[in-house]
Structures are given as structure tokens and as C-alpha cells.
Amino acid sequence: MFTGIIETLGIVKNITKDQENRHLTITSSITSELKIDQSVSHNGICLTVVHIENDDYTVTAIKETCQKTNLDFWKIGDSINLERAMKLGDRLDGHLVQGHVDQIGTCIAISEENGSWVFTFEYDATLGNITIEKGSITVNGTSLTVVNSGVTTFSVAIIPYTYEHTNFHTFTVGTKVNLEFDVIGKYITKLNNMNWSKSEI
């Protein structure tokens, strides 16, 4: 479980394929604090550390993870949002984030407004995911508040600190991002769509 508060940016150092798996080597400032089998959020994807060497560590993504996330768009040199799993007793400064990406979204607009930035993203609403204004959304692992919610689009406002300390400053129109919708909202939507009989209520 994560909070969506990004700790640092990592850099993709190497990408190798092993049958249908993908091994990704990341350089980061928190590598010395990691251990084998530790869970780390990479752009919102929960991946397990399998190897550590100096300032680099390696994680492995299986075929399903690659298909459901923006991993296919990663390149050597890319900046990746990193967050280690939260501990019981930590402050929950963002919101509950599982590290399970629901779908890929696309950045369709970026505007600068009074020193901050507004990013608009498009997503596939037919998959059953929804956003609500003032609700929580995770974009590339970053906990954000929806400021404008449409049927297939939503917008978020990014303050300068978040812009500089996450990979939002690398986004352009067309950038593919990982989206994780609010877990509480997903359960409510699922329950609401079920046909309950009176005996089950």
C-alpha cells in the first residue's frame, strides 16, 4: 500500500527482455535504503526489488503488467516517480494507493495558470472507472485531486513543487500515464452495479 506522495525520481538505466518478462534497472537516491523483495511504486506500478548493485536496483514486470500499464513506453533515461510502501503508523498525506494500475490514460491538454499547471487526461470510461470532482486520482503514482470531471476526461492542478519533484514536468500532449482510480470509489461503483435481492440486503 502506498500514499501517492512521491519520494524521489529514478532514472531508467537499462531494460532487458526475458521471454515475456521485462527487467528494468533503475538508478535512484534511495537505492541504498532498499532491500531485496521490497515493494516500490514505479509510476504507480507496484514492483518488487530483485537485485541491488551500488546505486542501481532491478525490478521485474510480467506480461500482464506490461499490457495494463505504460511500461511499453518507457525508455532508457526516462524519469520515474518512486515511492516505497508505507508503514503502519505513517501519516497518510495522500490517499490509499494500491499500486495496481487500472488503465492507461493520455494527456490531452496542458495549461499554465497563475504559476501552477492544469493537466487534462482522457481515459476509457467503458472499463467502468469514474472520477468525481474533489475526488482522489493517482496519475503515474502521484496522489492528486480531480478539479474537473467529465465522462471520459478529468483535470488536475499541479503546484510548482509537485511539478518539479515528479515527472509531470516531462509531460507533453500525448504522454501516456498510469491511472489508478480511488479504491473506495471502485468498490462503491461495483456494489452499486450489482443486482441485490431483498434477502441479500
What do these predicted regions represent?
Residues 1-201:
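Conserved loop->alpha-helix
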